[in-house]
């Protein structure tokens, strides 16, 4: 057994070294045994940046060797302190911690039968855990003592279809009624409780008039001295695909805004900056100079007298209470705004790929809200309603209600066993038990941020930091078994390496060219190309979506280990996310197995354990 072993880490290119990050460390068999390892591991590892400054790090063990030594550990730290490179050292002797680390304590300051009371040094909030947990994830979120968010709640809209006689019908004669479901939280679990990282899991279903449909699992990640809370939302299909169509899915934040309506700002990050307010100080009579509007949108201090032209104009200008950003495809978004629900929606702006973040802010603060993979997992959206009021509702839409409802049904009512290679003669397509995960981040602010800060926030949400060792280091320690490093000394070796490079580049380019995006599709690729139609066989069951056939997950993760390329990591991460969620049955009659390649990810009668085996995603799990 060795002591004081050091692992050298670096942040992947195109990833901002900011915000909190969790990374993995690998230890050879028998090389690391830490007696009396504590749950948070604060005294078991030392993390230092390039300046040799010690950084607090929270740790937990994720895998052991048969001899009881540590194989893999997971560590959480502040990436802004780590910088581009850092070194992690294991300490055999416990108790050797810095003064800063020694002062850290749990962020749960109090708990009772109904609430968890949390204070991370910047944010304070309470999480319902008892009978009163009802439909909220968190309540009373304060920033430095000032209430900014009253509550955070999951939101589900279902379009329910049938054939009964109804006044609500479409041209096809089907009844179509959209209903709003509230969350019914059944269980709240503390998964990690340390001085740097707190993870809380909420599980439940959605309810409308005592009818429960669909399920969810939502994790909240809270970190020391951070004004941000990350929400990882997993939706499970638990309904009837013949009648239940997804119309809206997200998390809503009831936000407190101070100041007058014209001091209530809305901004969207994007290709072009979009910034407006509930009332825009753009008046012909009384005449307001352009400088007034500029000052307003820049969030400058006011102090206008009650009888000023500004106040007179504000009392007689349109009040834009609702703004929304809607990404309707991988290549188009729209921004709309509305005064009242009984009035039309104005199209305010359009573009290609939104950055997926908005800021809603009053005189003394508000929130930033961002969705990861915003355009990749369309139809997504961001919305604020009641912007002019003291209490505005801000929603991160993982599936925007602006979109046509999502249809979970199969493409036919029978199986094409022989002609389309769809397995068995019986009909086996079912979405019951499949899932999909989305992420959003809430950042609470004390004032309107600088213009570039919203885009910086959006970039961090979309491209969070990833810290890894070099391919050489992983190879030397035989992490993840036996594999090779790139070698081009001989002609056959050079040929094979070039083929691997070209193969990855081909699929990376096909994802973009074929637009393999969307909430339930992003991360997967197609199985077989049709040279006659010059497209992939998207409509033939045995040849359409890959669904881990020929294990592209293994190929991509091994390719990442060999190259350390950030673009490879991004594609592999998306595939692991998709294949472990959408292609996999999490409950129901086929729980634990997955669906092989098909037109719909949950299609045909071929349900196989090879699709759902853990080996597909072990690299992703242990590295992150």
Task: Name every feature range the model reports, one short phrase each.
Residues 148-150, 154-155, 165, 177-184, ...:
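Catalytic cores of eukaryotic secretory-pathway lumenal/extracellular enzymes that build
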Residues 72-95:
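Intrinsically disordered, low-complexity Pro/Gly/Ser/Thr-rich segments with frequent PxxP/GP/PP motifs
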